[in-house]
Curated annotation (Swiss-Prot):
Protein's GO biological process: chemotaxis
Family matches, as SUPFAM superfamilies: CheY-like (SSF52172), Methylesterase CheB, C-terminal domain (SSF52738)
Response regulatory domain location: 3-121
Name recorded for this polypeptide: Protein-glutamate methylesterase/protein-glutamine glutaminase 1
One Pfam family in the UniProt entry: CheB_methylest
């Protein structure tokens, strides 16, 4: 049983979070607090396993509270609930730097609650079970000949935890994650958090990045991540990141399709794709492009996804090689990359 303390100055958010978690037999709400000072007292008293934490609160805000976490023996795991603003994104990045374990966007209203309830439960359980990587090997600086492409939206972040934590540090490929998120810094915070739990080096994309083996790039929100061809000193082809501010595709930016289609043109049959949870049709056309180029295509099975729109779009095009459980996807990725390298 995971014991949770809900911390938020909004009665609406406190009530919503309690309602979303109340039907899960593995989670118990042990209390609520409306500001950081009250929360510190309740952490000492109730000893929760995890707190959901608002940042902007009276008396003592969430960041100041995290700065005081050393005052408490065995400070609980921390899930930040962030507002959908550029300021909220910046404060979320600071919270991750101060030791928060994960974050997610607050529900915008009643219609949004069902969409995020499942993700909230997944995140809480992931946070309490996943291990941090404290030291990473120094990798040989080698341009990637193979690329792994992962696309996800609603419900995707907890699934990304599972995948990146199980990929080996010597993966002979670059990895690009395209996760639908609002711009303003949320994808940087996602990359920083994933970097803690993976043996691979993970960061947000920068314009001009050359794809390297053993590295994971998270597509920067507000731009499409395009892969173009680049030659290394030995004349071998690899890929380079171009961030473009072209119009949204499927009403999102970054779009999975833009990344997948460009990768197919550069890496051809040296691509592996995986579509995870997400609503809408993004990723279907891109998966088809990878399949036509000779790459290997994967979608997660429906029972492991919060929303099955993106995976269903790919399946409807008859271009999917493997429908797998979430737990089986990392193993299949590694197996496929090894086969590509002979």
């Amino acid at each position: 049983m995971i014991r949770v303390l809900v911390i938020d100055d909004s009665l609406f958010i406190r009530t919503v979070v309690q309602d979303m978690l109340s039907d899960d037999p593995d989670i118990q709400i042990v209390g609520v607090a409306s500001d950081g000072l009250e929360a510190l007292d309740k952490i000492r008293e109730l000893k929760p396993d995890l707190i959901t934490l608002d940042i902007e609160m009276p008396r003592l805000d969430g960041l100041s509270m995290l700065e005081r976490k050393k005052e408490i023996d065995r400070f609980p795991k921390t899930l930040v609930l962030s507002s959908l603003t550029s300021e909220g994104a910046e404060m979320t990045k600071r919270a991750i730097a101060l030791g928060a374990d994960d974050f997610m966007l607050k529900p915008r209203g009643i219609k949004n609650i069902r969409e995020i309830g499942g993700e909230l439960k997944h995140k809480i359980k992931n946070i309490c079970t996943i291990a941090y990587i404290t030291a990473k090997p120094v990798l040989k600086d080698s341009n990637a000949r193979n690329v792994v492409l992962i696309g996800s939206s609603a419900g995707g972040p907890p699934m990304l935890d599972t995948i990146v934590s199980k990929l080996p540090s010597d993966l002979n490929a670059a990895v690009i994650i395209t996760q639908h998120m609002p711009k303003g810094g949320f994808t940087a915070a996602l990359a920083a958090r994933l970097n803690r739990i993976s043996p691979l080096q993970i960061r947000e994309t920068e314009n001009g990045d050359v794809l390297k083996n053993g590295t994971v790039l998270v597509s920067r929100a507000g731009f499409h991540t395009i892969i173009s061809s680049v030659l290394d000193k030995g004349g071998s082809q690899s890929g380079k990141i171009i961030l473009t501010d072209s119009p949204p595709v499927h009403n999102v930016k970054p779009a999975v399709d833009k990344t997948f289609i460009s990768a197919a043109q550069v890496f051809g049959n040296h691509c592996v794709t995986a579509i995870l949870s997400g609503m809408g049709n993004d990723g279907g056309e891109g998966t088809e492009a990878i399949k036509k180029a000779g790459g290997v295509t994967i979608v997660c099975r429906e029972e492991d996804c919060l929303v099955y729109g993106m995976a269903r779009s790919a399946l409807s095009r008859n271009c999917v090689d493997h429908v797998l459980s979430l737990q089986a996807i990392p193993e299949k990725i590694v197996e496929t990359i090894r086969a590509m390298n002979g």
